[in-house]
């Protein structure tokens, strides 16, 4: 799992720590431009796969406005706007928060987190779960078992994942939110999202464009995926737990990253360096390490 060093943490020009992992960059034609580590390694893509899950829902009949479709693809911050959006998806299907089977959580904002009671709407995957439930209602599928791997919805999602990645799911586990989680390669993740962004299928076009048009719904103010999509025209990006990230440009150039220790602190630097290899400026500020409250080093990509 370790892979190769992707980022270094420096202090007074000395490398104090490193983050290793796996990285693959695809050319517009789908060939590999650059790699570090082993992109054929099977990983759990976590929430970086939500656009493919959402595609399966739209294909099965989910019909909601683009802003809410972006929320179905989201790992959101639990702001009032995000929670209201998830509730709107449920309400359109005649459901309420009680139907959600994601875990309880608080908003990510520190002030809100101190005062808010845990709810399912505040959980960062509530948009996805609301979309899943709405898709079940449209198709007359059971809503109480929508997270079971053998449920028609989850079988449809798995089929979409395998079709888009070109791989067979090696193992089905359970994600942090309770939804089925699929094991396949980092390269398969890159190919799946590349296929999404270059697809002529109206389903895929709708999902990708919703995220590009409403990046604030996909993550939240100041967060990596939101700010990079805001700063790079046409970019699609989705990160996931345990330090996974995938990003794709409209012409099909795509990157996928897995940091082996699961720590996200170097993700901005690594993603910025990867985009630079495509000739794209992510407009990201350097991340400093501090000594006595002052910058004494930086977190930088090692490639």
Predicted features and spans:
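Structured C-terminal helix/loop/strand segments within mature extracytoplasmic catalytic/sensor domains
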Residues: 197-303
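Beta-lactamase-like hydrolase cores
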Residues: 1-40
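Active-site SXXK
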Residues: 45-62, 81
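Short, flexible loop/turn motifs enriched in small residues
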Residues: 15-20, 49, 239-241
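Bacterial peptidoglycan biogenesis and beta-lactam-recognition machinery
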Residues: 29, 58-66, 95-98, 140-145, ...
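Short glycine-rich loop/turn motifs
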Residues: 19-23, 130, 158, 242-245
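Short active-site loop at a secondary-structure junction
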Residues: 19, 34-52, 67-70
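Active-site-adjacent helix/loop patches that line small-molecule binding or acyl-intermediate pockets
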Residues: 67-169, 195
């Amino acid at each position: 799992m370790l892979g190769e060093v992707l980022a270094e943490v420096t202090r007074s020009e000395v490398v104090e720590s490193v983050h290793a992992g796996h990285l693959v960059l695809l050319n517009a034609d789908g060939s590999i431009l650059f790699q570090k580590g082993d992109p054929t390694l099977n990983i759990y893509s976590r929430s970086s796969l939500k656009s493919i899950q959402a595609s399966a829902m739209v294909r099965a009949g989910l019909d909601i406005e683009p802003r809410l479709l972006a929320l179905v693809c989201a790992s959101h911050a639990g702001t009032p706007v995000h929670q209201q959006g998830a509730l709107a998806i449920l309400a359109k299907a005649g459901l309420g928060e009680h139907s959600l089977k994601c875990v309880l959580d608080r908003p990510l904002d520190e002030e809100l987190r101190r005062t808010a009671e845990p709810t399912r709407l505040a959980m960062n995957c509530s948009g996805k779960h609301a979309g899943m439930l709405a898709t079940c209602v449209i198709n007359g599928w059971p809503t109480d078992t929508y997270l079971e791997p053998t449920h028609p919805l989850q079988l449809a999602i798995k089929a979409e994942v395998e079709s888009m990645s070109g791989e067979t799911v090696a193992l089905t586990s359970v994600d942090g939110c309770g939804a089925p989680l699929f094991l396949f390669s980092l390269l398969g993740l890159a190919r799946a999202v590349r296929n999404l962004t270059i697809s002529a299928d109206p389903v895929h076009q709708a999902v990708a464009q919703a995220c590009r048009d409403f990046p604030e719904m996909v993550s939240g103010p100041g967060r990596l995926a939101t700010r990079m999509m805001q700063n790079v025209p046409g970019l699609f990006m989705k990160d996931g737990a345990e330090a996974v990230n995938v990003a794709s440009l409209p012409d099909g150039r795509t990157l996928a990253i897995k940091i082996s220790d699961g720590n996200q602190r170097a993700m901005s630097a690594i993603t910025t360096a990867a985009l630079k290899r495509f000739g794209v400026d992510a407009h990201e500020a350097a991340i400093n390490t501090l000594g006595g409250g002052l910058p004494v080093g930086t977190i930088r990509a090692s490639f």
